[in-house]
């Protein structure tokens, strides 16, 4: 099977996902320079119901339109809010309800950007889509591999690990070969409206709101006790869903007799008792794990796990690669690390690599302590 990306650019119609940011803007520009037939598409994935537009959708659409006008391409718009609600947001709420800490960006990429958007673009007659993600692709025979972006500070393969090779084969990543300062310089040189626009941060549908204020609109909080590892009650929490492993801020613990000056950290969430377990010190033994169990595994392309494999992994975005052994056991996928891993968090994603190739990953189900707990 010949990859669609290998066709003559002049005969290849590419629709770029235009977010209103600098990365997608430059992606569209680069594709034009490479000779592709380029159009843009702006996705609206969230319906604001209070008029304040936390997602800045109106401003982002205006920026996307300004860029498309500048470089002379058509901009389509599409509303995927229903798909986002059904396939991303409801799962996000279910995970928080279960006391886990999900990552909606990963689901959004799989279900919206590389499914709903891809299908819609193909229905418009596109041969390929393109996005502003900092990743690369490599065609090897019948397979298309997902590679890390060349800029280690911006590599986004962690967020794309659940996108299949067939979808990657239909996608171009023009800025994956560049570093961020180069991208901004290109945008500035060509007078693009997004050249100096700040990168978006956080979850789109929450925007600048406090996370706890947003979450309590949808989920009832269940207050409970805060305990030390010895079982001493030292405070109250407003709901386990507001806390994550390794968290330091917002615990409301202070001025305890004989407690010392070291800050308190979330060590464990006891879902059965609705108790938040905390301890003092950034290096508290309970913060470290030697292994994890993962579920909901997605591989970019099929891999052979008939015997354990030496790989690297990330348990959070921008973490350096961690050496591990991945094996398929009777209870599921288990990754054993060479070094202790801090704040391994159920609900977050673990992503596996073989060198620069992103193999895929899954959701962290549980972490195994580095040292025995009393």
UniProtKB/Swiss-Prot annotation:
GO terms for molecular function: ATP binding; tRNA binding; tRNA-uridine 2-sulfurtransferase activity. GO terms for biological process: tRNA wobble position uridine thiolation. It comes from the Bacteria. Pfam families: tRNA_Me_trans (PF03054), tRNA_Me_trans_C (PF20258), tRNA_Me_trans_M (PF20259). Residues 103-105 are annotated as: Interaction with target base in tRNA. GO terms for cellular component: cytoplasm. The keyword tRNA processing applies. Coiled coil: none annotated. Its main location: cytoplasm. The active site is at 108 (nucleophile), 204 (cysteine persulfide intermediate). Its EC number is 2.8.1.13. It is found in: Cytoplasm. ATP binds at residues 17-24, 43, 132. It is an enzyme of class 2 (transferase). InterPro entries: MnmA-like (IPR004506), MnmA-like_C (IPR046885), MnmA-like_central (IPR046884), MnmA-like_central_sf (IPR023382), Rossmann-like_a/b/a_fold (IPR014729). Residues 154-156, 316-317 are annotated as: Interaction with tRNA. The record marks 133, 348 as: Interaction with tRNA. Keywords: ATP-binding, Cytoplasm, Disulfide bond, Nucleotide-binding, RNA-binding, Transferase, tRNA processing, tRNA-binding. It catalyses: S-sulfanyl-L-cysteinyl-[protein] + uridine(34) in tRNA + AH2 + ATP = 2-thiouridine(34) in tRNA + L-cysteinyl-[protein] + A + AMP + diphosphate + H(+). Disulfide bonds join 108-204. PANTHER family: MITOCHONDRIAL TRNA-SPECIFIC 2-THIOURIDYLASE 1 (PTHR11933:SF5), TRNA 5-METHYLAMINOMETHYL-2-THIOURIDYLATE -METHYLTRANSFERASE (PTHR11933). Catalyzes the 2-thiolation of uridine at the wobble position (U34) of tRNA, leading to the formation of s(2)U34. Belongs to the MnmA/TRMU family. This is tRNA-specific 2-thiouridylase MnmA. It comes from Pseudomonas putida (strain GB-1).
């Amino acid at each position: 099977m010949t990859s669609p990306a290998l066709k003559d650019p002049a005969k290849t119609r590419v629709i770029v996902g235009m977010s209103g940011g600098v990365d997608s803007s430059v992606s569209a520009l680069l594709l034009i320079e490479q000779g592709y037939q380029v159009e843009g598409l702006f996705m609206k994935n969230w319906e604001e119901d209070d008029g304040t537009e936390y997602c800045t959708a109106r401003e982002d659409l205006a920026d996307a339109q300004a860029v498309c006008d500048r470089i002379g391409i058509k901009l389509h718009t599409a509303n995927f809010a229903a798909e986002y609600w059904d396939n991303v947001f409801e799962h996000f709420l279910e995970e928080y309800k279960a006391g886990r800490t999900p990552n909606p960006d990963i689901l959004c990429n799989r279900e919206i950007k590389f499914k709903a958007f891809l299908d819609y673009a193909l229905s418009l007659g596109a041969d390929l889509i393109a996005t502003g993600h900092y990743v690369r692709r490599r065609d090897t025979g019948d397979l298309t591999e997902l590679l890390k972006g060349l800029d280690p500070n911006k590599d986004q393969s962690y967020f794309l690990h659940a996108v299949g090779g067939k979808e990657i084969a239909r996608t171009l990543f023009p800025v994956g070969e560049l570093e961020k300062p180069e991208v901004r310089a290109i945008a500035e040189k060509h007078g693009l409206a997004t050249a100096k626009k700040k990168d978006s941060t956080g979850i789109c549908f929450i925007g600048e709101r406090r996370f706890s204020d947003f979450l309590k609109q949808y989920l009832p909080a269940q207050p409970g006790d805060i305990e030390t590892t010895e079982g001493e009650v030292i405070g109250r929490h407003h709901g386990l869903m507001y806390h994550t492993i390794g968290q330091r801020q917002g615990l409301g613990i202070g001025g305890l007799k004989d407690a010392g000056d070291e800050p308190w950290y979330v060590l464990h969430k006891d879902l059965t008792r609705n108790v938040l377990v905390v301890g003092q010190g950034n290096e508290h033994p309970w913060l470290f794990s030697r292994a994890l169990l993962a579920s909901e595994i997605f591989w970019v392309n099929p891999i052979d796990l008939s015997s354990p494999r030496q790989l690297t992994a990330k348990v959070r975005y921008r973490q350096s690669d961690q050496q591990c052994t991945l094996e398929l056991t009777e209870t599921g996928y288990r990754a054993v690390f060479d070094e202790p891993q801090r704040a391994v968090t159920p609900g977050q994603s673990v992503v596996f690599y073989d060198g620069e190739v992103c193999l895929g990953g899954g959701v962290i189900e549980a972490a195994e302590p580095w040292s025995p707990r009393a």
